[in-house]
Amino acid sequence: TISTMHLSQTTFVVVDLETSGAAPSMGAGITEIGAVKVRGGEVIGVFETFVNPGVEISPFITQLTGITDQMLANAPTIGQVFPSFIEFLGPENENVLVAHNAPFDVGFLKAAAAHLDYPWPNHHVADTARLARYVLTRDDVINCKLATLAEFFGATTSPTHRALDDARATVDVLHGIIERLGGFGITTLPQFKKVKKRLVSG
């Protein structure tokens, strides 16, 4: 059952988005979705798609992500990909949604759901940026940026500001964090969901 589920049995869906701007409220949209589903340290599913946001991509965003208007010209709209993405997330009472700086990605996904009049599932959301601050000290890392953590945990994929690469890097960071949490006796999903306080000082 969920109440005793060990983290090694938990399915985590690690998501990263690229977007056309900083906030949905400013008219920005999703340009790319990358998601990796993992359980017990194994990748059991991958979701990747470009999304046509219906707005032009600024030179700044193209420079940051390498994504151009031409790449998105024939891409599906968020309305076309959203149902299959929600299906990929899986059952909300079992799977955990993970993102680095989760409020950003989840904010865009919730805005898309609202715009499409699509029910947003109530998955537990784990933010690797926040979790890293609980298990690491300033002596370990200078900041909790994805690239810094990916290097610290020896991630096999380097973040590139492309959705799937960043999601894969976040998977390795998540696994590193879970290993650290085990050292604090946190091994089950209910314990994981309750991690709210810093576990290390400094």
Please place each PLM-identified region on the residue numbering.
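Conserved glycosyltransferase catalytic-site signature
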Residues: T128, A163-A167
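Beta-strand segments within the central parallel beta-sheet cores of soluble alpha/beta enzyme folds
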Residues: H124-D127, L189-Q191
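Conserved non-catalytic scaffold segment of RNase H-like nuclease domains
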Residues: T1-H123, N143-H161
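Short alpha-helix plus adjacent loop in nuclease-associated cores
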Residues: A114, A126-I142
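Acidic two-metal-ion nuclease catalytic site recognized across multiple nuclease folds
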Residues: T1-L7, F152, V171-G202
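Short glycine/threonine-rich catalytic loop with a Thr-x-Gly-x-Asp
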Residues: R138, T160-L164
